[in-house]
Amino acid sequence: MRPAFITCVILLLFSSTETFAEDFEKTEYKADSARTLQYALLEPQKVEAGKKYPLLLSLHGAGGRGNKNWERNCLANKILSGREMRSQYPCFILAPTVSKQGSWKSESMDDVLELVEKLLKKLPIDPDRVYVTGQSMGGGGTYEAMARKPELFAAGVPVCGGNKVENAKKIAAIPIWAFHGEKDRVVHVERGREMIEAIKKAGGKPRYSELPGVRHNSWTPAYKNQEMWKWLFSQKRTKTKSS
């Protein structure tokens, strides 16, 4: 009996952490530009009639480029697709991807934002609760998405990402909680600091968590931070933010 019990426990643990990918529906979007954008979409476990849900735009890092399992490259997807989290924070998760040589600072971001607008019309999404997050290249993409369409987002969580400080003025009104590892040598921590300081100078009030001793993998403590998720899903777009 003991081996059978152990096997059941292992299977339960495996299913709770690995089957999340099966719940993401992978498809593609033909943009107005005629470009094709591949993406994965996770819906709430139960969509109730007449109710609207948040949408989280989740951007992968460079390791997800040209990867057939790109949705696994952002830890946020795995965390939020767990049973308890899906129950606590029912939402739509949009996880697009770029080509092997692509970037979130390219025309691909225009296609992503166009897709978000289409989904807002098609699905029961609360337009005042559209969020964006991403790690590494996706962290930079988080800043980029907010800068290109600041009126769209209620909040953003860039993780170990940087962007042009010139964009700070565009996103200063958006609630932001950024994370960066103190010892990051891939996307140097100075880039994160510079962006936060620029946002503050532009009148913003971003939250910034610099993680002592942490290198590039700051997404692990960031996305396992329950306070962050509680904060993110409590944010709502206001007239001031969308003006």
Language-model-detected regions and their locations in the chain:
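Short beta-strand/loop motif that positions the catalytic acidic residue
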Residues: 171, 177-180, 184
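Primarily recognizes the serine-hydrolase "nucleophile elbow" in alpha/beta-hydrolase
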Residues: 117, 121-122, 128-172
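Acidic catalytic loop of the alpha/beta-hydrolase fold
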Residues: 183-188, 217-218
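Short alpha-helix in the alpha/beta-hydrolase fold that links the catalytic acid
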Residues: 71-72, 188-198
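Gly/Ser-rich "nucleophile elbow"/oxyanion-hole loop immediately N-terminal to the catalytic nucleophile
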Residues: 45-51, 100-137
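Active-site machinery of serine-nucleophile hydrolases
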Residues: 55, 59-113
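Catalytic histidine-centered segment of alpha/beta-hydrolase-like enzymes
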Residues: 214-222
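A domain-start/cap signature at the N-terminus of enzymes
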Residues: 17-55, 133-135, 140, 145-148, ...
